[in-house]
């Protein structure tokens, strides 16, 4: 019984050490991933979402694929749920 508990505890400590070592090596990975996601997202916003959220009225229309919201008076995506 004592031997199995000792081996289990040793295995858990070894697993913790291995996980900590791999995490410390890859510490910069999440930062790089997030920065690349936000960089790609900002490029997408400039190209595709140029009109989303712009102020509008019924005389001054929105870009293609967008409609002027009656409630908020800004450009929103056109869709089947819009009246």
From Swiss-Prot:
This is U5-theraphotoxin-Hs1a 6. The presence of a 'disulfide through disulfide knot' structurally defines this protein as a knottin. GO terms for cellular component: extracellular region. Keywords: Cleavage on pair of basic residues, Disulfide bond, Knottin, Lectin, Secreted, Signal, Toxin. The keyword Signal applies. Agglutinates erythrocytes. Residues 1-21 form the signal peptide. It is found in: Secreted. It comes from the Eukaryota. Pfam families: Toxin_12 (PF07740). Residues 22-49 form a propeptide. Expressed by the venom gland. Disulfide bonds join 51-63, 56-68, 62-75. Belongs to the neurotoxin 10 (Hwtx-1) family. 51 (Hntx-8) subfamily. Hntx-8 sub-subfamily. It comes from Cyriopagopus schmidti. GO terms for molecular function: carbohydrate binding; ion channel inhibitor activity; toxin activity.
């Amino acid at each position: 019984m004592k031997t199995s508990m000792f081996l289990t505890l040793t295995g858990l400590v070894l697993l913790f050490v291995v996980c900590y070592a791999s995490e410390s090596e890859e510490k910069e990975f999440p930062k790089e991933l997030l920065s690349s996601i936000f960089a790609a997202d900002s490029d997408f916003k400039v190209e595709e979402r140029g009109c989303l959220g712009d102020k509008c009225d019924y005389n001054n229309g929105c870009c293609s694929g967008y409609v002027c919201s009656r409630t908020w008076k800004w450009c929103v995506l056109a869709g089947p749920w819009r009246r």
